[in-house]
């Protein structure tokens, strides 16, 4: 229904509608869906590609799910030949559903340092049929790391980082927030947890959305599209992310689209934006602390840097409004305030020529 409405409203270029008229049309639609729609309306690429493979991701309300498995046994399963079978319980159209799924652990760092293991989920076609998973049968499930006080706020901050990137670039991984009832099945007893998490779509689905392909080999960052590479470097600077490498595809994928190589990031937990306690004192491969905000990128034409800088300045209000939508979702006000201060510091740098040149432009390799 929403899809057809957007088709009528936006895809004919000769039709111009004022914002208030669109809002009247959408006033019965939940706020987060309206926000998603307006993001799509601002980009032809977003509008054309968001609705491919979207039965799970078009609805941005948190999806309630239930999982039961042994976290300890899952940690032993690290490849597709040793999948753990269980059931996924969820609610679809106000009805309780369950499907068979296969799980394996993912993420080297988190498997070593976290209580909750990140999960890759695979669903057989026959099991996913007639469910919201029919178009997305391979997914990443992101869970909190530790069972500590900040676990849900940390995962929410990481989720928000994905939503910021949706504003910044049309090339992104779709996400869906989750409310998870998880039972850790141990030998002697069972332990139950109520967690916040989210699904990330599979990279093959991203490629299909753009009628493109994922590049798996190592490629020099200088061979990648100038604007999209610098755009990603600015985003990583915004969230304080130094735990990535486009060349080695560490916490990122490369999309070959219209003869351009475009980097797409994921995994934003070890960042200054989230600042999890389990990251304190740990350094990355470059020797940077995960608490530091450092610009990592290669030198490009000054015009590219100026274009990206203006891009972020233009989007400032939209980013701020999007982030503020999630304020009521935080369990602790301090977590939200620290995140907003971190975002504010980024724009203080971007809006100050001296700071911008010394902390961004001069740091390019």
Q: Where on the chain are the PLM-derived regions?
A:
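Phosphate/dinucleotide-binding and metal-coordinating scaffold of catalytic cores
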Residues: 48-365
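Bacterial Sec-dependent N-terminal signal peptides
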Residues: 3-48
């Amino acid at each position: 229904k929403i899809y057809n409405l957007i088709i009528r409203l936006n895809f004919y270029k000769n039709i111009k509608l004022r914002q208030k008229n669109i809002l009247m049309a959408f006033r019965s639609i939940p706020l987060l869906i309206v926000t998603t729609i307006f993001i799509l309306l601002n980009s032809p690429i977003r509008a054309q590609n968001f609705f491919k493979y979207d039965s799970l991701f078009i609805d941005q309300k948190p999806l309630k799910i239930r999982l039961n498995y042994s976290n300890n046994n899952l940690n032993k399963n690290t490849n597709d030949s040793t999948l753990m079978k269980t059931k996924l319980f969820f609610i679809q159209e106000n009805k309780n559903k369950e499907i068979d799924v296969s799980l394996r652990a993912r993420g080297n760092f988190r498997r070593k340092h976290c209580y909750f293991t990140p999960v890759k989920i695979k669903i057989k076609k026959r099991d996913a049929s007639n469910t919201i998973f029919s178009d997305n049968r391979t997914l990443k499930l992101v869970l909190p790391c530790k069972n500590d006080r900040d676990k849900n706020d940390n995962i929410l901050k990481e989720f928000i980082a994905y939503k910021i990137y949706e504003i910044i670039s049309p090339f992104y991984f779709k996400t869906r927030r989750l409310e998870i009832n998880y039972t850790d099945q141990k030998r002697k007893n069972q332990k139950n947890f109520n967690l916040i998490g989210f699904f990330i779509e599979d990279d093959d689905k991203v490629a299909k959305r753009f009628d493109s392909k994922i590049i798996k080999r190592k490629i020099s960052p200088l061979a990648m599209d100038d604007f999209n590479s610098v755009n990603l470097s600015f985003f990583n600077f915004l969230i304080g992310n130094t735990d990535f490498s486009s060349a080695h595809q560490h916490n990122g994928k490369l999309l070959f689209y219209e003869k351009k190589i475009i980097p797409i990031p994921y995994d934003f937990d070890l960042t200054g934006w989230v600042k999890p306690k389990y990251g304190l004192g740990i350094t990355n491969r470059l020797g940077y602390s995960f608490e530091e905000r450092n610009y990592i990128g290669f030198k490009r034409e000054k015009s590219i840097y100026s274009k990206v800088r203006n891009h972020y300045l233009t989007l400032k209000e939209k980013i701020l409004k999007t982030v503020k939508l999630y304020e009521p979702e935080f369990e602790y006000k301090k977590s939200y305030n620290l995140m907003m201060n971190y975002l504010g510091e980024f724009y203080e740098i971007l809006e100050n020529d001296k700071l911008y040149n010394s902390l961004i432009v001069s740091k390019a390799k």
